């Protein structure tokens, strides 16, 4: 569900099973890229989320569990990388978990 919090619109997850969010990204140069997720976690405990970095053919290039720490009422950043050099092209970043209730995402920055 999209809603505004502190003048920023984010995607907020409620109760449910098998929650996910996906971003489509494009890169220009062959290099390792930083992936920075702008998120909020209001649950009072860290939430583990499976992150997959997928190429245009559907091949998973990186799969990792990211633990999003609690962020009482504030947007914070969580960083990881593509893990390896990737070529210019189109990719997907997929975050999924059994339960993402209390977790929200505002943006994904790729640098």
What is each of the regions a protein language model found here?
Residues 1-111:
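Extracytoplasmic
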């Amino acid at each position: 569900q999209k809603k505004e919090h502190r003048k920023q619109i984010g995607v907020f997850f409620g109760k449910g099973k098998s929650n996910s969010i996906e971003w489509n990204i494009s890169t220009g140069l062959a290099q390792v890229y930083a992936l920075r997720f702008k998120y909020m976690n209001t649950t009072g405990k860290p939430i583990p989320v499976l992150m997959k970095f997928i190429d245009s053919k559907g091949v998973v290039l990186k799969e990792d569990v990211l633990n999003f720490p609690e962020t009482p009422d504030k947007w914070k950043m969580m960083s990881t990388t593509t893990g390896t050099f990737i070529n210019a092209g189109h990719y997907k970043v997929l975050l999924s978990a059994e339960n993402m209730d209390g977790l929200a995402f505002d943006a994904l920055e790729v640098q």
